[in-house]
C-alpha cells in the first residue's frame, strides 16, 4: 500500500495533466469559435473575476505594493485586476495567434498591429550578423516572435513551457505553426543557443523572470536575479542587442516596438560588462512596465530576497601571537 501511495504521489500530477488535455483543447476550440475580439474579451472577463481568488493574486498584490508604495490599496487592487485581464486575454488569444499578426503597411487603419522600428527588423535581417533581442511578459508577449518570422528574420525564441502538460502541448503546437526557431530553456539549452549565434542567427529571450543562477540587478529599486545569457553572448560575439515590447490597445489590437541597439557598458578592457549590460536591459524593461503596469505579469515571484547571494565579508585578521611575544621580549630587554 505504501509503495502504491508513493507511485501515485509521483505520477498523479502527470496523470492529472494528461486528463486535462481534452478540456484545454475544448476551451481552445471554443475560443476559436468566438472569434478574436470576443475570445479576448471573454478571456479577460473570466480572469478578472476568477484571478483575485487565486493564490497567485497574493503574489501580485505584494509585488505591486512594493513597486508602488505611494499608491493606495484601491489603486493596487485595480492594477492587479488589469494584470489578470491581460493574462486572460493573452491566454484566449493563443487560439488566434496565426491570424493576430495581420499587418499591412498599405492599409494600417484596418490592421490589428502597428510596428515601430521595422527598419531595425530589416537591418537585423539583412546585415549578415548575429543579433540578440530581449523582451518582457507585457501585453501579448508571443507577438514579437511572430513579427520576426513575418519580416523574414531568422530568429530563435527561448521559451519556458507551461507547467501543466495540457497547456504545454497546445502552446507548443501554436508556436510551431506561427514562429521561427524555438529553444526550450533548460540545462542543455545554452549550447544550442550559442550555436544559433555562431551561425549568424538571432536569439530572443524574455528577461523579466527570476533566474536562480543569475546576476544581481535592480528592478523597481530592489535587487533581483536575472539570466545573464544575452549579455554573455553579446560580450563573446560582439553582436547588437535590441529590446522589443508589445503594448495592448483596444479590441485585441497591439503596438509592437523594436528599439535601436543598446549602448551597453564596458569594462576597463573595453569588453561588455555582463552585470552592467543586464542592468541596462532591465532598466529598459522597468520603463516599459511603468508605462503600462496593468499589462505586466505581476503574479510571478520576481523578487526573492532570500535567494540573493550573501555579501562577501572580508575575513577578520587574527592577532599574530608570535609578534606580540616578540614585542614583549623587546620591551623587557630594553
What do these predicted ranges mean?
Residues 2-135, 170-172, 179, 323-332:
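Membrane-anchoring hydrophobic helices of lipid-metabolizing enzymes
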Residues 86, 100, 126-186, 212-217, ...:
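Catalytic core of membrane glycerolipid acyltransferases/transacylases, capturing the structured
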Residues 107-113, 160, 179-184, 219-221, ...:
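Short, flexible loop segments at the rims of nucleotide/cofactor-binding pockets, characterized by
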Residues 121-122, 145, 171-172, 193-194, ...:
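Short amphipathic alpha-helical segments and helix-helix/interface helices
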Residues 29-34, 140-145, 193-204:
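Short, composition-biased local secondary-structure segments
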Residues 58-59, 160-165, 224-227:
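Active-site metal-coordination segments of metallo-dependent hydrolases
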Amino acid at each position: 500500500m505504501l509503495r502504491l501511495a508513493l507511485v501515485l504521489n509521483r505520477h498523479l500530477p502527470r496523470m492529472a495533466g494528461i486528463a486535462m488535455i481534452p478540456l484545454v483543447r475544448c476551451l481552445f476550440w471554443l475560443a476559436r469559435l468566438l472569434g478574436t475580439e470576443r475570445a479576448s474579451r471573454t478571456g479577460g472577463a473570466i480572469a478578472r473575476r476568477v484571478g483575485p481568488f487565486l493564490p497567485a493574486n497574493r503574489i501580485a498584490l505584494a509585488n505591486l505594493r512594493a513597486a508602488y508604495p505611494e499608491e493606495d490599496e484601491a489603486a493596487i487592487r485595480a492594477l492587479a485586476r488589469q494584470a489578470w485581464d491581460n493574462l486572460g486575454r493573452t491566454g484566449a488569444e493563443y487560439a488566434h495567434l496565426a491570424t493576430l499578426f495581420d499587418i499591412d503597411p498599405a492599409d494600417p487603419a484596418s490592421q490589428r498591429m502597428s510596428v515601430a522600428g521595422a527598419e531595425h527588423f530589416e537591418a537585423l535581417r539583412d546585415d549578415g550578423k548575429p543579433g540578440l533581442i530581449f523582451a518582457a511578459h507585457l501585453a501579448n508577449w508571443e507577438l514579437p516572435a511572430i513579427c520576426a518570422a513575418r519580416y523574414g528574420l531568422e530568429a530563435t525564441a527561448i521559451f519556458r513551457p507551461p507547467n501543466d502538460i495540457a497547456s504545454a502541448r497546445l502552446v507548443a503546437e501554436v508556436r510551431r505553426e506561427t514562429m521561427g526557431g524555438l529553444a526550450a530553456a533548460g540545462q542543455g539549452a545554452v549550447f544550442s543557443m550559442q550555436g544559433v549565434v555562431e551561425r549568424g542567427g538571432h536569439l530572443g529571450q524574455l528577461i523579466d523572470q527570476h533566474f536562480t543562477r543569475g546576476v544581481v540587478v535592480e528592478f523597481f529599486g530592489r535587487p533581483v536575479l536575472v539570466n545573464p545569457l544575452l549579455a554573455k553572448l553579446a560580450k563573446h560575439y560582439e553582436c547588437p542587442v535590441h529590446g522589443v515590447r508589445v503594448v495592448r490597445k483596444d479590441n485585441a489590437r497591439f503596438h509592437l516596438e523594436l528599439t535601436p541597439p543598446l549602448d551597453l557598458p564596458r569594462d576597463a578592457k573595453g569588453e561588455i560588462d555582463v552585470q552592467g549590460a543586464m542592468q541596462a536591459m532591465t532598466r529598459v524593461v522597468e520603463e516599459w512596465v511603468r508605462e503600462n503596469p496593468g499589462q505586466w505579469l505581476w503574479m510571478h515571484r520576481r523578487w526573492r530576497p532570500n535567494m540573493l547571494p550573501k555579501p562577501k565579508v572580508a575575513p577578520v585578521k587574527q592577532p599574530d601571537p608570535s609578534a606580540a611575544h616578540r614585542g614583549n621580549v623587546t620591551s623587557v630587554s630594553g
